[in-house]
Amino acid sequence: MPAPAEPKPVMHVMAAVMLDALGRVLLAQRPAGKHLAGMWEFPGGKLEPGETPMAALTRELHEELGISLLHAEPLIRVPCHYPERELLLDARQTDQWEGEPQSLESQALQWLLPEQVDPSMLTPADRWILQALRLPTRYSITPADVRPEQRRLWCERIGQAIERS
């Protein structure tokens, strides 16, 4: 009976969902010779031993794009299972950085609106990030006890509250 396979170590990777003033996201193309070469991804990279997730993301964006990350918020964490590796992709969303992103590691870059991104051009893990990015930031949930005749009034009040804010 063969021995059970050793569990693969999990590689923790950070990704930045960088949104510009027009609502576009920055994508980088994986270079030749790397896993999933030619596919597009959100910029970022691996954590180094002892590094915090934000420190890793800040370092990677400086190395790859020449920018200084000022702040980022968690968006989604995606566990990925590839035949050759296990991956935890930790995506953070930001519109706060200093500098103009430029390719410092010979990767192609492009800015696209989230709805313009074809999921098939992304790595499988990055498709989950795109899906999370496309979700609404807020949902309106009607109370369960609202009678049909009260729904119109309830919706009008919600509309008024939105206009005031």
How should each PLM-predicted stretch be described?
Residues A132-S165:
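Conserved N-terminal beta1-alpha1 strand-loop-helix module at the mouth
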Residues P2-L26, K46, R77:
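Conserved N-terminal beta-strand and adjoining loop/helix that marks the start
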Residues R24-I67, I76:
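Conserved Nudix-box catalytic region and its N-terminal flanking loop in Nudix hydrolases
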Residues M18-G23, A32, T142-P148:
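Short polar catalytic/cofactor-binding loops
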Residues A91-D95, P101-L133:
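NUDIX/MutT-family hydrolases
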Residues D20, V78-E100:
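Active-site-adjacent beta-strand/loop module that shapes the phosphate/pyrophosphate-binding cleft
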